[in-house]
Swiss-Prot record:
It catalyses: L-homoserine + succinyl-CoA = O-succinyl-L-homoserine + CoA. Coiled coil: none annotated. This is Homoserine O-succinyltransferase. Its EC number is 2.3.1.46. Belongs to the AB hydrolase superfamily. MetX family. InterPro entries: AB_hydrolase_1 (IPR000073), AB_hydrolase_fold (IPR029058), HAT_MetX-like (IPR008220). Pathway: Amino-acid biosynthesis; L-methionine biosynthesis via de novo pathway; O-succinyl-L-homoserine from L-homoserine: step 1/1. The record marks R322 as: Important for acyl-CoA specificity. Transmembrane segments: none annotated. Substrate binds at R225, D354. It comes from Laribacter hongkongensis (strain HLHK9). Its main location: cytoplasm.
């Protein structure tokens, strides 16, 4: 297989093992853990051209490239990462990591608990965005990266980029926060709870210890994903793609799949339930719920951002109702009030929340322009 000139080509996942205990926000301590990660491009001698990509709820470390020549699925942000792409691997050293609690190689509920010899399951502790950032900082130390040229993330990944700028202000030159929010709204917490209930009430869940029973709570995962997927799309986007199209010529007057949108959602749910871990889904949604950096400052986001040193790009999409532009503007206003440097882009799109994964021309142009400036400043 011949790869396009702007592809990172064949890649391989790596694993970093840590035996220094990690104290979590919940009060639990992980004595040892592993992080699965990938890198693209080359770290320069000054070690100042590194970019960290933080993934969203269902993401992972495989950001770009393919694992073998006949691999049909490129990394989840392959359209944005590669030579000559906005996140240009000819100029930057790019790192993608699967977060703690994940199900793609990093230590999580499906990993073996060394204390028992069995999967962690329900015993795996809740993890938070600050916990992830602490573990990512240890990975950065291992890779010889003292300061990121940029930390970039969309949705839950954007929360991590924001947390990086606050927790390690001296280690982040730029933070790109895309389609995100400074905390979840009550409606978003409600969506997450309904999704969790779908999993928790699945008879095959077994209190989180389904591994020992040789089953998977597919029904719950399927419903959780179907609900989530609706919130990632826009009404206009769904209408344009599916409308009221029927799979057959007319109504069947039953409860089987009739509309194309029903078929699409069930396909997405079926696919996801075969790839993702139910306990990880619960952990990721709780990490979303708990993220609220202003909480420690009596709800004052300006005060929470007072120590940041990074320059910011905040980006939002007009049709995103899960993380609406108003939520991004909250971050912008707080940064301005705190006297920080921030650029804001609001992109016209019909793709809803998922637009941050797409290649709408204004979005690509915004990312390219901002990161070109970052690269030029490094070269100066």
């Amino acid at each position: 297989m011949t790869f396009a000139s702007d592809s990172v080509g064949l890649v391989e996942a790596r694993r970093a093992d840590f035996d220094t205990p990690l104290a979590l926000a919940s009060g639990t301590v992980l004595d040892r853990y592993s992080l699965c990660y990938e890198t693209y491009g080359e770290l320069n001698p000054e070690a100042n051209n590194a970019i960290l990509i933080c993934h969203a709820l269902s993401g992972h470390h495989h950001v770009a490239g393919r694992y073998c020549e006949d691999d049909k699925q490129a990394g989840w942000w392959d359209n944005m990462v590669g030579p000559g792409k906005p996140i240009d691997t000819a100029r930057f050293f790019v790192v993608g990591v699967n977060n703690l609690g994940g199900c793609h190689g990093s230590t999580g509920p499906s990993s073996v608990n060394p204390a028992t010899g069995r999967p962690w399951g329900s015993a795996f502790p809740l993890v938070t965005v600050p916990d992830w950032v602490e573990s990512q900082a240890r990975l950065a130390d291992l890779l010889g990266i003292r300061r990121w040229a940029a930390v970039i993330g969309g949705s839950l990944g954007g929360m991590q980029a924001l947390e990086w700028s606050m927790r390690f202000p001296e280690r982040v030159a730029n933070a790109l926060v895309i389609a995100s929010a400074p905390k979840l709204s009550a409606q978003n917490i409600a969506f997450n709870d309904v999704a969790r209930q779908a999993i928790l009430t699945d008879p095959e869940f077994h209190g989180g210890d389904f591994y020992a029973h040789g089953v998977v709570p597919r029904r719950g995962l399927r419903l959780a994903r179907m609900l989530g997927h609706i919130t990632y799309l826009s009404d206009d986007g769904m209408g344009a793609k599916f409308g009221r199209l029927l799979r057959s010529g007319d109504y069947q007057y039953g409860f089987d799949v009739e509309f194309e949108i029903e078929s699409y959602l069930r396909y997405q749910g079926d696919k996801f339930s075969g790839l993702f871990d139910a306990n990880t889904y619960l952990l990721m949604t709780k990490a979303l719920d708990y993220f609220d950096p202003a909480k420690a400052f009596d709800g004052d986001l300006v005060a929470a951002l007072a120590r940041v040193r990074a320059n910011f790009l905040i980006a939002a999409f007009t049709s995103d109702w899960r993380f609406a532009p108003d939520r991004s503007r909250e971050i912008v206003k707080a940064l301005v009030a705190a006297g920080k440097r921030v650029s804001y882009g609001e992109i016209e799109s019909t793709h809803g929340h998922d637009a941050f994964l797409m290649t709408d021309s204004p979005y690509v142009a915004l990312m390219r322009a901002y990161l070109n400036r970052v690269a030029e400043e490094l070269a100066a």
